[in-house]
Amino acid sequence: MAYLTEGQIAMFQTYPETFVMHIYPSRRSCAVPNEVYDLSKSGNANMIADGEGVDGVVGSIPFPDASEPLHHVWNHILRYRGVDIVGGAPYYVVNPDGSMTQGAGEAIAKNCWNPFVKESYCKGLQGMLMQKVTHPPRLADASLLVIESLNALESPRKAWVYDPGTRRVRRAPNIAYDYLGSASQGLSTADSFDGFNGAKDRYNWSNAGTKLKFMPYNVYDFYNADRKEVLTNFHVNQKYMRYELVKVNIVRADIKSDKRHIYPHRVMYFDADSYGMISEEVYDGKKEIMNYRELPLMNFYDEPACLAVHSATYNFATRRYLLNNVRSSEIDKIIWRADKPHDIQLFTPNGLKRYAK
């Protein structure tokens, strides 16, 4: 039991007949390009603006000797994730009876904090993201543009949406914090994308120790499986999941007394090797568990990059789950470095309109 998280214990208690964890020897196979490791030898970056910003060697692991809770959060946000990315963005909301809602989309991204970006327009930015819905038909061509800076206090997130009904682009300042997108059906917030993203000012952050825990790792069977095989009642098909004993840095986020968020208390687990978030528990105001999230890691050797194959969010009240950002070997395959850098004109309101069409 010592190696299980509270979220995993809750899964066993809620689904005693179906939830299992297959434990394998630890492989510690994560890797990123050597350039990232070389740049990280200069030591820690600096947190600025009360932790809302970072100043340091672009492309490095910002805090290789992390000691503060937000160091771990920034390491996760700025970990290596490719350069000029092109890929799919499917999602599934699965009900207890096995029925589901599914959707699909396209995404392109420019990750500015990495050693291979030379474009001057990336200065001061984390990156830029564009997404377009392709399914279901009623939402087709609805699109989103997000530009994220390295200092949320000085330069807050900029977001725009394209509405295919009106054929207009408008600013979307509400796409942050606990904004609930229609696709997630209330199972995930804007700041839960990729584990955690965006401003950090609504929480008090604290370290909860470094421990060994069973975590979803090297899930190649899931990556190679037929999509129909992995989507089962209550949770993903655990036949395709594997867990290893992993060293994780645990960080708590507790809502400030003068702030609001539908996730008042969060416990985040950051993999010590890849620096990425690998699991999370969300608690309500009474500190009773609401959601358990897994972000199973896998080494993409062709890049190399060590990233989540999907994000699975399990809600205990409704017994529904959201599976999104699903990557697989056959469909929705990620291109980590496009043949040529993405044009900056793509990541503008006019570019969003062209991209949506």
Label every model-predicted segment:
Residues 138-139, 151-153, 243, 258-262, ...:
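Short glycine/serine/proline-enriched coil/turn segments at secondary-structure junctions
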Residues 140-143, 155-156, 261-265, 278, ...:
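Short, surface-exposed coil-to-beta transition loops
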Residues 132-136, 162, 254-256, 283, ...:
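A generic structural motif
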Residues 92-93, 99-135, 191-268, 278:
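Extended beta-strand-rich segments in extracellular/periplasmic secretory proteins, especially
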Residues 1-156, 163:
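Solvent-exposed N-terminal domain segments of exported/luminal and surface proteins
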Residues 1-55, 165-166, 177-215, 219-238, ...:
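Non-transmembrane domains of secretory- and envelope-associated proteins
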